């Protein structure tokens, strides 16, 4: 099972069985024999896709002519993974993201679904202007642009105002600094410095 397939299985559990992403991720990482690189990649795919969930669906709706509830949940999750890689992961070649998504659709659905996934993702690659992030300061636009739940953005705006809400959302999207803490009962300063 490759990294994207593991990520898909986790997303299927999260979105169809209401599993917690962190618990499902831990279980799958322990269950599968994976390299450290694959483990990091799966973690980024799962957490990134879940975090950007509303934004990914907003983008998907721009390229699909039917209601999303008429599409198999697994295909929606394959498209979420593909869109996340194409839009938010700069180091992943767009063609690789598209081809791997098509392969997953063939394996987990049928040839028609694979063609559908291919068409959606190829159009996404060809027409990036179609999913340009909204630039306004309305709650719904800010939620899409900054990948935050709408209810949280509304609460930020109500509590702190629009400008502070934007800064809060942007701050939430930064990586936390690495902080190391030692247990002074088990280690001494000399040992830690080496």
Residue ranges and their predicted role:
Residues 1-194:
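Class I Rossmann-like S-adenosyl-L-methionine
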């Amino acid at each position: 099972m490759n990294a994207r397939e593991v990520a898909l299985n986790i997303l299927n559990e999260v979105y169809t069985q209401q599993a917690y992403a962190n618990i499902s991720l831990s279980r799958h990482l322990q269950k599968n024999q994976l390299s450290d690189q694959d483990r990091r990649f799966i973690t980024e795919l799962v957490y990134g896709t879940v975090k950007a969930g509303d934004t990914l669906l907003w983008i998907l709706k721009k390229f699909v002519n039917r209601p999303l509830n008429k599409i198999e949940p697994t295909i929606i999750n394959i498209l979420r993974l593909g869109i996340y890689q194409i839009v938010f992961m700069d180091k992943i070649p767009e063609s690789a993201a598209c081809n791997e998504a098509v392969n997953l659709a063939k394996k987990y659905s049928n040839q028609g679904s694979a063609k559908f996934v291919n068409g959606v993702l190829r159009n996404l690659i060809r027409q990036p202007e179609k999913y340009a992030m909204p630039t306004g300061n309305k709650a719904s636009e800010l939620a899409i642009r900054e990948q935050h739940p709408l209810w949280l953005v509304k609460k930020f705006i109500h509590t702190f105002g629009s400008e502070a809400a934007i800064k809060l959302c942007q701050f939430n999207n930064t990586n936390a600094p690495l902080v190391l803490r030692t247990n002074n009962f088990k280690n001494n300063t000399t040992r830690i410095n080496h």
